[in-house]
Structure formats: structure tokens, C-alpha cells
Amino acid sequence: RDAQESRGLGDVYKRQYCAKADFVFNLAGVNRPKVESEFMAGNFGFASTLLDTLKAHGNTCPVMLSSSIQATLIGRYGKSDYGKSKLAGEELFFEYSKTTGAPVLVYRFPNLFGKWCRPNYNSAVATFCNNIAHDLPIRVNDPSVVMHLVYIDDVVDELISALGGREHRNGDYCEVPVVHTITLGGIVELIRSFRQMPGTLSVPDLSDAFTKKLYSTYLSYLPEERFSYPLKMNVDDRGSFTEIIRTSDRGQFSVNISKPGVTKGQHWHHTKNEKFVVVSGHGLIPVSYTHLRAHETPEHL
């Protein structure tokens, strides 16, 4: 709001945007004020100004409010001034809908996380990812605390759906349908495992949705020089063998270089499937199947 006034945009905001908008996303808010009284002024106050301006122009377009789980004022949020200001904003929106008939979409977001979020500010996940990626210390007061997390890409998908009238509702409120529940200690353990993976050539289990999202988030904090790391090339007279990636459930990926006339392998596996992709040169790969007679050895060129 202050930025709008300082740039002379306040009048444009009130006269043009609020008059002509087809949908309003109210994502503005105050979460780190210098004094606690700014919570109410920034969260409730701005919401009041926004709705009054829409009402003055007779614009009853849908209005979305970004609220917080802290507005429940339950448990550790019971004395939250931030939560109280968000709850006041919610009540204002619901009353506005009753008096004008305008649709309101109130989202009580839990903890949000995602790529490039500002660390050491308002997100524990951002701080943990940044500090662990840079080998900085972190502090976890209670690893057993249960976190309810929503990934920012899922938030964006939901808001786009809301714009098209396909929001997910739960009673009076709207919600992002994908919420991940995990302890604080579990988050830290996962991020620390990401930090160690280049040394073991491992990759996370990306079949798990939360792990995939957290790993993507972690990578956005990784220093540029750590995107590459050395590989060990095992060299002998026959050529070389270099492991590239190891997985916990899908084997490994490697580069095998064989010199001309060299035979490698000459062993078998009872429970294993190997795939070869020839990227340069040519060779003969004989394959033996136990159900074939001894003299039957198919070969692949």
C-alpha cells in the first residue's frame, strides 16, 4: 500500500483496478511488523479499504483472502496477534459477502514452502534448506512438532482453479487440497540426506510427493559450485567403469568403456535386469538364459 501511494498509484488502484477487476486476489499482509499494532492496521485495515473501494464502485466480483491457520486461535496460536488480525479480516470478508452478495473465498493457509522462499524470515523450511545447503548451523527446538505444509506450486494451481470458479471448498472456507503432514525432525532429516547424496551418488525417492517437492525446494538454495561433483572412474587394462547415479530401488546408472577386443562381464545374476545403451562404437553382447540348452547362446550386435 505504501509503495502504491509513493508512486502515485493509489488513485489508479482505487478508480481503475477496483472498478474494473473481474476477480481480486488479496495476498497482501503484514507478518513481521515493528510493533504489534501494525498487524491489525496492515491485515484488517487494508482488507477494509479494499472492500470499501469495491463496494463504492458497485463491483461484486469474487474476492479471495489469503488468511492463516493462526486465525483459528487454537493451541500455540491462542495469543497470536497476527492470528487475531487475520480472523478480523475473515469476519470482514464474510460480512461483506452477506451485504453485497459478492462471492468471497477465504483460504486459511497452513505453513507454505517452495523454491526461493526468503530464509531466516518466515519459513522454517526455507531456513533449513538454505542453511544446510550452505553448511550453516540450524536450531530445532522440538523435532516432534507436527507441521502441516502446502507447496507453493499447489497453491498456485488452486488459485488458478479458483479464478475459473473451481475452488475447493470446505464449509465457509476454501482450501488447497494437497497438504503434507510431517514432523519438524522429519523435515530436517530429509534435507540433511539431500546434502549427503552427492557423496554417495544417490537420488531421493521421487515417487513420494513431499520428498520430490522438498528436494526441488532444497536445490533452489544450493550454491552454484555444488551442482557439479566428482565421479570416480575405475580404470584398468580393459577400459573403465564409472558410476553416475545410485537409487535405493531402481539400481544404478553407469558408463562402461571397453577397449577393442576386450571381453567384460562373463557372469550372471539370478535376480537382476540390466539394460545396455551403446552410444559409441560397436560390440557383441552374448546373453545366456537358464531355460535354454547349453549350446543356445543368443547374441546381440
Functional labels for PLM-detected ranges:
Residues D2-Y13, H291-A294, P298-L301:
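Single conserved hydrophobic/aromatic residue that forms the stacking wall/gate
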Residues R15-F44, K55, Q70-Y77:
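NAD(P)H-binding glycine-rich loop region in Rossmannoid oxidoreductase-like domains
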Residues K34-M64, K84-L92:
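NAD(P)-cofactor binding segment of oxidoreductase domains
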Residues T72-L73, D81, Y107-V125, L136:
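Flexible, glycine-rich beta-alpha linker
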Residues S80-L105, T127-N130:
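Active-site Tyr-X1-5-Lys
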Residues T127-V150, R169-D172, V176:
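A conserved pocket-lining segment of Rossmann-fold NAD(P)-dependent short-chain dehydrogenase/reductase
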Residues S161-M233:
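Mid/C-terminal beta-alpha module of Rossmann-like enzyme folds, strongest
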Residues E225-Q266, K272:
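A short glycine-rich, His/Asp/Glu-containing loop-to-beta-strand
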